[in-house]
């Protein structure tokens, strides 16, 4: 990461969360190359996976996208208030009340209808609202069941159904038996409706053409998360994070670091304290496991991760490079969110959302 971008961030905060819009655009275009005539509907829920929903929305709009998925009504309204032309916003949570439907109608937001209760609520609204029907074909989370088709058809007007969707449960594990079963099920279901289809999430996109159908729904892949372990598919990480050194010290063999004395030095060790902690989304499960980087050199995080601070072993770094304010890479070119996920025992989504949420960002 160029020093000028880090310096730019320091006007706002010592911690640097940098979002590269060019890489986001690159990932969009890499996905576009793979899907032929199918259409991309970006998933920008979870504050665009921690990257900032408004800026990511605008960037993807400039890439040519006009349709977007969000999970919360307030996010859908926020996007509609941007007043960009010809956008469709699809609300994954659907509707829970007449009041919600009032907002859907006012802002022309299209809900995902997941069950008969939601369908009845939207049918009772005095103004017609177009929606998407979501069928459960194996996820067992949200969605109509196959057995409910007759009831659904009796409650729906064909012109109000924009398309039919389902969600793959095991695409990231490349469980082709399950994925093909779900694909066949949704095709069978759609034979009753004859509408456009959407089945592929990020991982589903990379399973092959048969899963693309009319619409694909990339989420994590837009932000550079590879759908399958250690396969890049040309995707680039969009988020980089840097934090400054606050202090350095040398401790003797046998001395300990941090709360609970969980780290004991096996030899004389140079330690740097970094202005970053779990209040910034750094997972405490990473203690004595994760690494950070100084000028491309790996340094172990040692001791417990504190609310605002982490301590690192910098014995391998020259003293001249350990000055106050020196930028330490938490996430970036040397360490992907996949690396951090492995080190902390979670998935890449949680890493990005945890680190990105509630942070001030610089967009480049």
Protein language model features and the residues they cover:
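Active-site-proximal beta-alpha core segment in soluble small-molecule metabolic enzymes
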Residues: 11, 15-19, 23-26, 36-188, ...
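Conserved N-terminal alpha-helix of the aminotransferase class I/II PLP-enzyme fold
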Residues: 30
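Active-site anion/phosphate-binding pocket segments in diverse small-molecule metabolic enzymes
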Residues: 2-20, 25, 75, 95-96, ...
